[in-house]
Regions:
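Ubiquitin system architectures
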Residues: 2-18, 24-43, 53-56, 70-147
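A short, exposed loop/beta-hairpin motif centered on an aromatic-Gly-Thr core
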Residues: 58-64
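Mature soluble extracellular domains of secreted precursor proteins
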Residues: 46-48, 64
Length: 147
């Protein structure tokens, strides 16, 4: 997990564009293939993704195998490329009405074009800030934000 806290990566960029914060160098194949989260025999790995700039709404997914650093970054990347769950629009844009209107206007009212990434405002590019485990929810939380 120390490696994850040393990764600089913008979640809207391909995973292989990540670099080490400490050196500015690309991750090696060995680092990308290292295990980020090891699966317990008896239960799946739960990863929760932030889908709101105000830290109010998360989506949780379960995985049933070990997750390498590269796979984790790919999971995150593709999650934010997915179409937004339109039934959760009010939850996703909670306390962000102006941003919701801007995004909807940008896509000319075509809600089907919205992706999970659109939940974040354009004031800064969201970057990966690590992964935090919460015992209470038994879930790993993808930390997103400007550092």
């Amino acid at each position: 997990m120390d490696l994850l806290s040393d990764i600089e990566w913008y979640i809207n960029s391909k995973p292989k564009t990540c670099v080490r914060k400490s050196t500015g160098l690309n991750l090696t194949k060995e680092e990308l293939n290292s295990i980020a989260i090891e699966k317990n025999k008896n239960k799946n790995i739960r990863i929760s993704f932030l889908v709101n700039d105000n830290f109010k709404y998360y989506v949780t997914r379960e995985y049933n195998e070990n997750i390498t650093v590269e796979k984790l970054l790919s999971i995150i990347y593709y999650f934010y490329k997915e179409s937004m769950d339109l039934s959760k629009l009010d939850d996703i844009f909670y306390e962000m009405d102006e941003w919701k209107d801007e995004v909807i206007n940008y896509y000319d009212g075509n809600f089907k074009k919205l992706t999970n990434y659109n939940a974040f405002t354009d004031t800064c590019t969201p970057d990966f800030c690590g992964l935090e485990y919460d015992k209470k929810t038994d879930s790993y939380y993808v930390m997103i934000g400007p550092e």
